[in-house]
């Protein structure tokens, strides 16, 4: 870890505990900062808060003490990425011209290990996991490691102390995190895709959302690389105007891109066949595109075809992202709880050749599901719907001509009904197309319950 003086003896307010708040607090203490941590939740019985308190961090919880800015001067406010900029503490800090930063920028600025960054509306976690797997295989030959960090669930500040210049950080960045960075310079940055109707409750407009994503490349220069989706032409134009890095592209079908999906192989435009598609374990065209991004990043960071082939042929998928759960009575069952929007379901549903029994539904964000009608018509034989959006999804299913439409209240009810509708040789796919918050705290919790309910089928 680099010993920088930026935060030494600085008075810093951390807003929000959570995983990243806890980790960045410990990092900042080692960098010599004086810390106050505030969380709207009561932290009086929180073990992490108690640990920080023993280390000398002042803890203020249960409310936001906006008046604290009138009593003392802060040099920085470190904001949990999920806290909106309309938060009164953030608004007050900005009004006083106090820099508002986030954990990734602090951690990456002290990292001795080089780093690459990946963002996107869908597919970024799988891409990060694939890249980490390829690069770990490559770096291990010389005693190094690749670490998957960031929005994937492991704070960067948790890893930077042990990561050396022999290692690599593969960083997943959300739009929330990117909005709070001003000076990160990844050797390779990649945007997997950008779709509308994602996080507009936070960013307010699609244009704001795109601009947040583009911050991943804003500090890159001609010595760096930017990986862009050749098929999203409207986004590509903005990316090319924004970046100063060398650009490489990937495409589902266009052979003029640097990397593309061929008939039997993932290929590069120099007619090089990199990976046999039939050897890739994770299903779906979208996952083949994720593989292309991981290949592009890894090639630039020194990996060879053998590293790529080993990693892609042994990777069975990220949890809650078209995750294979089990085969039960000749039905293959998949958990795609990360399908929190229509676009995610759009890429999941066409991933299988077998007839599908689909389970969908969740939080109503005011979207219509008519765009799913052609996919329902082509791939879905039966559908079980639950949650706030069940009737809206049922309308789309009727338009698609699906005869077996079952409406229930909860996911627990949906699972056995889906099994009853299925036959040997079918796929049972849980791809909600909606956020989880009507019945679950997170998509991870929702996916865990789905797997639990599936396993309960075997006991009945």
From Swiss-Prot:
Pathway: Cell wall biogenesis; peptidoglycan biosynthesis. Keywords: ATP-binding, Cell cycle, Cell division, Cell shape, Cell wall biogenesis/degradation, Cytoplasm, Ligase, Nucleotide-binding, Peptidoglycan synthesis. Gene3D superfamilies: Mur ligase, C-terminal domain (3.90.190.20), Mur-like, catalytic domain (3.40.1190.10), NAD(P)-binding Rossmann-like Domain (3.40.50.720). ATP binds at residues 120-126. GO terms for biological process: cell division; cell wall organization; peptidoglycan biosynthetic process; regulation of cell shape. GO terms for cellular component: cytoplasm. Its EC number is 6.3.2.9. It is found in: Cytoplasm. The keyword S-adenosyl-L-methionine does not apply. It catalyses: UDP-N-acetyl-alpha-D-muramoyl-L-alanine + D-glutamate + ATP = UDP-N-acetyl-alpha-D-muramoyl-L-alanyl-D-glutamate + ADP + phosphate + H(+). GO terms for molecular function: ATP binding; UDP-N-acetylmuramoylalanine-D-glutamate ligase activity. Cell wall formation. Catalyzes the addition of glutamate to the nucleotide precursor UDP-N-acetylmuramoyl-L-alanine (UMA). Belongs to the MurCDEF family. PANTHER family: UDP-N-ACETYLMURAMOYLALANINE--D-GLUTAMATE LIGASE. This is UDP-N-acetylmuramoylalanine--D-glutamate ligase. It comes from Lactobacillus gasseri (strain ATCC 33323 / DSM 20243 / BCRC 14619 / CIP 102991 / JCM 1131 / KCTC 3163 / NCIMB 11718 / NCTC 13722 / AM63). The gene is murD.
């Amino acid at each position: 870890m680099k010993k920088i003086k930026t935060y030494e003896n600085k008075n810093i307010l951390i807003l929000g505990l959570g995983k990243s708040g806890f980790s960045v607090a410990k990092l900042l203490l080692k960098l010599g900062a004086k810390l106050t941590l505030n969380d709207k939740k009561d932290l009086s019985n929180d073990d992490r808060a108690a640990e920080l308190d023993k280390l000398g961090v002042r803890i203020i919880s249960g409310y936001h003490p906006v008046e604290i800015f009138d009593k003392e001067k802060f040099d920085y406010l470190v904001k949990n990425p999920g806290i909106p900029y309309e938060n009164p503490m953030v608004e007050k800090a900005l009004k006083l011209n106090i820099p508002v930063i986030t954990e990734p920028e602090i951690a990456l600025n002290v990292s001795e290990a080089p780093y690459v960054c990946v963002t996107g509306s869908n597919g970024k976690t799988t891409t990060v996991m694939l890249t980490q797997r390829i690069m770990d295989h490559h770096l291990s030959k010389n005693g190094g490691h690749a670490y998957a960090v960031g929005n994937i669930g492991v704070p960067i500040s948790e890893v930077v102390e042990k990561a050396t210049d022999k290692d690599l950080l593969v960083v997943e960045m959300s739009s929330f995190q990117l909005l709070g960075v001003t000076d990160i310079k990844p050797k390779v940055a990649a945007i997997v895709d950008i779709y509308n109707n994602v996080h507009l409750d936070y960013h307010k407009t699609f244009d704001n959302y795109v601009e947040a994503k583009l911050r991943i490349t804003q500090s890159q220069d001609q010595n760096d690389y930017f990986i862009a989706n050749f098929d999203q032409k409207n986004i590509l134009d903005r990316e090319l105007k924004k970046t100063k890095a060398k650009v490489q592209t990937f495409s589902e079908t266009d052979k003029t891109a640097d990397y593309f999906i061929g008939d039997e192989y993932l290929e590069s435009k120099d007619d090089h066949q990199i990976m046999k598609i039939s050897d890739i374990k994770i299903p779906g065209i979208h996952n083949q595109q994720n593989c292309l991004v991981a290949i592009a990043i890894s090639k630039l960071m020194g990996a060879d075809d053998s590293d790529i082939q080993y990693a892609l042929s042994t990777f069975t998928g990220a949890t809650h992202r078209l995750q294979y759960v089990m085969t039960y009575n000749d039905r293959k069952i998949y958990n795609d709880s990360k399908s929190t929007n229509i676009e995610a379901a759009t890429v999941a549903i066409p991933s299988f050749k077998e007839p599908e029994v689909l389970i969908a539904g969740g939080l109503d964000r005011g979207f219509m599901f008519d765009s799913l009608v052609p996919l329902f018509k082509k791939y879905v034989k039966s559908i079980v719907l639950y949650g706030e959006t069940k009737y809206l999804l049922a309308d789309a299913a009727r338009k698609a001509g699906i005869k077996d439409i079952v409406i229930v209240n909860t996911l627990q009810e949906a699972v056995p009904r889906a099994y009853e509708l299925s036959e040997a040789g079918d796929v049972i796919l849980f791809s909600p197309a909606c956020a989880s918050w009507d019945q679950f705290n997170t998509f991870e919790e929702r996916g865990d319950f789905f797997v639990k309910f599936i396993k309960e089928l075997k006991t009945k």
